[in-house]
Design a protein with these regions (language model features):
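Short, surface-exposed loop/turn segments at secondary-structure junctions
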Residues: 56-61
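Accessory beta->alpha helical hairpin/"wing" motif in late/C-terminal subdomains of nucleic-acid enzymes
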Residues: 128-164
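A glycine-rich, hydrophobic loop/mini-helix early in the fold
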Residues: 62-101
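Short, hydrophobic/amphipathic alpha-helical patches that form generic packing surfaces
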Residues: 39-53, 70-76, 120-123
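Basic amphipathic alpha-helical segments that dock to polyanions
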Residues: 113-125
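Eukaryotic partner-binding/assembly regions in large regulatory complexes
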Residues: 1-52
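Leucine-rich, amphipathic alpha-helical/linker segments
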Residues: 157-179
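Winged helix-turn-helix DNA-binding recognition segment
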Residues: 108, 126
């Protein structure tokens, strides 16, 4: 009797027995939205609009670059929110917090698309880098308009929902260390 815990292996064996050959039609493959510059820009705009803080009496706003990267990473992956909440609630209980952070950091550290989008937005004048901070640039109002338009047209409901959940999770500096 075949083992029921290995359905993928069973399917692979059946396909091999029947001499099945995969056919890939590139025109029918959909690229992942996670690598789309416009999508990532929209997510950065939503996160920046919600979490960036005012800089003195100016209209400029800023956010820690590590915080922005973590928040947009989690916005794109809302299934990680329960783990982040547990990580945050664990506080300085290092063993418990470390276990949660390792699972999240594994994917987070290899996510270079965010860095590329931020570099693009800096080159366009939408954002500026200032030491460890990301600051709204001379054309930073464009990001605010993107976020406003997304909300007005009720787009990206999942992402906006994740951002609202993130607003209730305390992201500490300890959580951001080493990022």
């Amino acid at each position: 009797m075949p083992e029921k815990t290995q359905p993928i292996h069973q399917l692979a064996a059946l396909l091999q027995e029947g001499k099945a050959e995969p056919i890939i039609v590139p025109a029918r493959l959909a690229p992942s939205a996670i690598y789309d510059v416009e999508y990532r820009t929209a997510v950065v705009a939503l996160v920046f609009e919600r979490f960036a803080k005012p800089v003195g009496p100016t209209e400029l706003r800023k956010i820690s670059s590590a915080r922005l990267k973590l928040l947009q990473f989690l916005t794109l992956r809302p299934w990680l929110l329960p783990a982040v909440r547990r990580w945050s609630d664990a506080g300085k209980q290092s063993g418990f917090a470390f276990g949660h952070s390792v699972r999240i950091r594994r994917g987070f550290l290899s996510d270079s698309a965010h860095d590329d989008v931020i570099s693009y937005l800096v080159a366009c004048g939408r954002l500026k880098r200032f030491e460890t901070q990301i600051v709204s640039g001379t054309s930073g109002g464009a990001l605010m308009e993107i976020a406003k338009s997304i909300a007005e047209h009720e787009l990206f409901a999942s992402e906006r929902g994740a951002i609202e959940q993130l607003a209730d999770i305390r992201i500490t500096n300890e959580m951001l260390e080493g990022w």
